[in-house]
Amino acid sequence: MEIRWLSILVDIPADRFDRSMEFWSAVTGWRPGRPIGDKDEYVPLDPPAGDRYLWFQRIGRDIPGCHLDLHVDDLDAAAAEAQERGARLVNSVDGLRVLDTPAGQPFCFVTEEPGRTRQAPPPPETASGRHLVDQLCFDLPAPDFERDADFWAALTGWRRRGQEDEFDRIAVPAWLPAQFLLQQLDEDAAEGPHAHLDLSADDRDAEAARHRQLGAEPVRRTADWTTLRDPAGLTYCVTGRRTGLRFT
């Protein structure tokens, strides 16, 4: 299976969708694109250069979240391979297959346009420096961590870099727009598997302050990242990684 592109889907409850879109458009400087879907439930943010990869989905449930879409040529073959590796097929519709990882993390396969060549957008730049939504972090309960880390490496063909403390990485090719980080939750964590956005920033504190001015709520600050909550209640992190740094 060849992965042709990837998209990050931010799942936002319908009653908070417009406010969240406004916030993330202001954060990135990217304008909302044309909605698609039977109910116009999918809206991209379109960068001025490069290809879109950050989408927002209007959902009926009350809890926001994130999931990954992998673009492939053959949906059925990709879904079959994922199931052979332990995934569960949840739904099958035209142009889309919805699955859960062995740990229960939702993800999708979508049909890539034949012959399409894509390019990752460059980082936006503001007074606080460069910044970019460039990582999806999979938050996994301790008993599920190894199983899902091995699943993603086997499914994509991209190697695990090796666990350090509670983290591991899947070595995503540098031409794709976002990286995968896996985080092992504490043994006593009540949450099930979920995912969150990470942003890299040249100046983490200045970037986090800009987000607060745009309406984000501060949650906590550690030595390596600052956790915030967007106006829809979506928790995400601004990290101290150098903007554009890729782990391959």
Residue ranges and their predicted role:
Residues 45, 187-188:
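Domain-length accessory/inserted modules outside core catalytic folds
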Residues 65-67, 192-195:
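Eukaryotic phosphotyrosine signaling hubs
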Residues 1-3, 12, 83-134, 140, ...:
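Vicinal oxygen chelate
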Residues 56-60:
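Conserved donor-binding loop and adjoining core beta-sheet/short helix segment
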Residues 11, 69-71, 139-141, 198-202:
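Short hydrophobic/aromatic beta-strand micro-patches
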